[in-house]
Amino acid sequence: MTYLLALDQGTSSSRSIVFDRGGRIRAMAQREFRQLYPQPGWVEHDPMEIWETQLATAREALAQAGLTASDIAAIGITNQRETTLLWERASGRPIANAIVWQDRRTEPLCARWREQGLADAVRDVTGLVIDPYFSASKIAWLLDHVPGARTRAERGELAFGTVDSWLLRQLTGGRVHATDTTNASRTMLFDIDRGAWSEPLLAALDIPRALLPAVQQSASHFGDTEPALLGHAVPVCGIAGDQQAALFGQAGFQAGLAKNTYGTGCFLLMHTGAQRQASTHGLITTAAAQVDSTAPRQYALEGSVFIGGAVVQWLRDGLHAIRGSGEVQALAESVPDAGGVVVVPAFTGLGAPYWRPEASGAIVGLTRGSTVAHIARAALESIAFQSAALLDAMSRDAVAAGGQPVSELRVDGGACVNDLLMQFQADLLGIPVVRPQVIETTALGAACLAGLGCGLYAGTDELAAQWQAERRFLPTMPRERAAERMARWERAVRQTVAP
């Protein structure tokens, strides 16, 4: 049994990937599921669709690999974080649809908590800010809007879980109600210093303790699957939220290692080791994957760009500049540079390190000679500019805490295959940008955690030696020129928030 099965449950689809012991992909299956928008600002998923698509892809991936469940050493789970489910403990029946991390319905409740002066306590205990993004307000909303839910929760009849807990419950036939440290750290209820649920916060936010799952380290034995599901019982030995799993899949095991996931948005995480670092630049302190119960707790700094690869979708669907996303690099490369054009894709405001929700998008520097190719190149460059500003903030936080600035950026996600973007990113940062051989790092991270949890791997040193780069993009732009480009970007950003 030298194969690992990663269940990668995302916001729009469920995927399953079979890895061999060397971290190579043997098979992959994927199924999309419905996005539900019952009211403006609301985003929901059907919990049973999440489960059914995930189980179907697991079976498909095994069949595609020509393997049976008895060939699998362990299962690892990685998941969209913060998305919230409540179900009946006895029957496993969900009492409502899952409220997705993107859902903003609980902003009035979060505003009330801020007015009550809870923001400092939440940041001190959890490392987070009070926001509908995280699970706590979603739990409270369900308790107050599903008839009888709060009373049943207080009696211990209901269970809360993020998506990993829900999948674990289904896989084990209801025997296990648990999560890992990384997912717990995204609920706004978890004390990341103590590694336990915060009783004072639970009381302040009026959330019953009886709802919550047990919390285990990310690489550990969570339980065994029901034999009938896959044809043989398989241990579940690894769980991590998607961004922490991606950092782990990038062999980000030590302080100072950083990764950027280029998806619809961009998610930048830097491992800070056993040191919890507070940010003065609008970043979030969160838990990194925990793999050794005898070692100190591990932490990370996290920041996100709202519009990353989505700017390419805008070029396609909004401007009709390209027919498909794969055309953007060729169009951008048809001109030597952006011709002074700067695109600031603040379509939904600006995230870290700016935190300007009122910002709106802008195209700056247009002249009579500007073409759609210049706009396409500027749009692509905007992904790198935003990531560079974020990494600069992260490095400043690291240095302020006595550490070192980031010296290398590991990249993954769909847009990392764009060589033009990756080279420009390296040029702006002045450090190597490294693309791994396996860019499915979220699933790989879950598989690696499962391999550690079941004893297939001896430790993270073995995994670090196994990680391989596909290409290193080295900076070629003079630093003075890079500074000029960043200064022009910052001037354009200021124009998007000008009164």
Curated annotation (Swiss-Prot):
Chain positions recorded as glycerol binding sites: R81, E82, Y133, D242, Q243
Q: What class of enzyme is it?
A: transferase
Catalysis performed (reactions): glycerol + ATP = sn-glycerol 3-phosphate + ADP + H(+)
| Pathway(s) | Polyol metabolism; glycerol degradation via glycerol kinase pathway; sn-glycerol 3-phosphate from glycerol: step 1/1
Mention one GO molecular function.
Answer: ATP binding
Q: Which residues bind ADP?
A: T11, R15, T264, G309, G414, N418
Q: Which residues bind sn-glycerol 3-phosphate?
A: T11, R81, E82, Y133, D242
Sorted alphabetically, the keyword list is:
ATP-binding, Glycerol metabolism, Kinase, Nucleotide-binding, Transferase
Q: Where does the chain bind ATP? A: T11, S12, S13, T264, G309, Q313, G414
The entry's protein name is Glycerol kinase
Recorded name of the encoding gene: glpK
